[in-house]
């Protein structure tokens, strides 16, 4: 019967856990938690840095790389080729349903 927990005093029962005195941690546990927090912050920072770097390189490589499929200036053969292709397509059109 000696291993029963002690009954807390009425003052301890009246206070909320927020207002109770925090338990002190051992120095080793405090160092471990500090190291863990530092590692998490470092990983988050490196992840954000790598994402920003990838976005920068993507935007730099794709700068102005859109294709309009318009013929270049002074290429009449390209214009004629486009007109003949559209004429061939109007001769016989089949629709599969």
From Swiss-Prot:
Detected in brain (at protein level). Highly expressed in kidney and placenta. Detected in skin, breast, heart, lung, liver, prostate, spleen, small intestine, colon and stomach. It is found in: Cell membrane; Cytoplasmic vesicle membrane. Keywords: Cell membrane, Cytoplasmic vesicle, Glycoprotein, Membrane, Sialic acid, Transmembrane, Transmembrane helix. GO terms for cellular component: cytoplasmic vesicle membrane; plasma membrane. Residues 58-97 are cytoplasmic. The chain crosses the membrane at residues 37-57. InterPro entries: SMAGP. O-glycosylated. The O-glycan is modified with sialic acid residues. May play a role in epithelial cell-cell contacts. May play a role in tumor invasiveness and metastasis formation. The gene is Smagp. This is Small cell adhesion glycoprotein. Belongs to the SMAGP family. It is a single-pass type III membrane protein. It comes from Rattus norvegicus (Rat). Glycans are attached at residues 7, 9, 15-16, 24, 26. Residues 1-36 are extracellular. PANTHER family: SMALL CELL ADHESION GLYCOPROTEIN.
